[in-house]
């Protein structure tokens, strides 16, 4: 079966999503096996980057860690699972995404799946292992530990926002139908 151009534009980025899941889970397995829990970890770039082994039962920045287990499962497991389903559903239902947006959404899907695997299969929470010095910015001497899935979600989310803003500016700079007599002229 030969894929059409549109089908390729939808499916090829999803292989990247799968790659994100594999890299994230393999890195977590390695960290879990070789880095002791709750220590200063392994220095990678001096004191700037360290590989640590910590668990986060909350969301980003441990938000929601104080919730009881039932609420935590609902708010941090079931709700994100529903959101992930809606993202995947809209990914396949629309042809409105440009290629950059498809790649960005695919990265978000891959990162989301990586963290959901931890959320449901790791009783201690999501394994975070990248620890970066932040020089006191926003009051953080070190940025809260994160993982590959988190990094991909944030990077792709930012890329998606920038692409939507750029797309909106391009659309708003085109003359309206009233100015061109119902025909777009560029």
UniProtKB/Swiss-Prot annotation:
Source organism superkingdom: Bacteria
A molecular function GO annotation: aspartic-type endopeptidase activity
Subcellular location: Cell inner membrane
Cell membrane keyword on record: yes
GO biological process: proteolysis
Enzyme active site: 128, 150
EC number of this enzyme: 3.4.23.36
Catalytic activity from the UniProt record: Release of signal peptides from bacterial membrane prolipoproteins. Hydrolyzes -Xaa-Yaa-Zaa-|-(S,diacylglyceryl)Cys-, in which Xaa is hydrophobic (preferably Leu), and Yaa (Ala or Ser) and Zaa (Gly or Ala) have small, neutral side chains
Keywords: Aspartyl protease, Cell inner membrane, Cell membrane, Hydrolase, Membrane, Protease, Transmembrane, Transmembrane helix
Keyword Disulfide bond appears in the UniProt entry: no
Pathway terms, separated by semicolons: Protein modification; lipoprotein biosynthesis (signal peptide cleavage)
Residue ranges crossing the lipid bilayer per the database entry: 11-31, 44-64, 70-90, 145-165
Main subcellular localisation: membrane
Membrane topology: Multi-pass membrane protein
PROSITE patterns: SPASE_II (PS00855)
GO CC terms: plasma membrane
PANTHER family: LIPOPROTEIN SIGNAL PEPTIDASE
Family per record: Belongs to the peptidase A8 family.
NCBIfam families linked: lspA (TIGR00077)
Alphabetized HAMAP family for the sequence: LspA (MF_00161)
Function: This protein specifically catalyzes the removal of signal peptides from prolipoproteins.
Name under which the protein is recorded: Lipoprotein signal peptidase
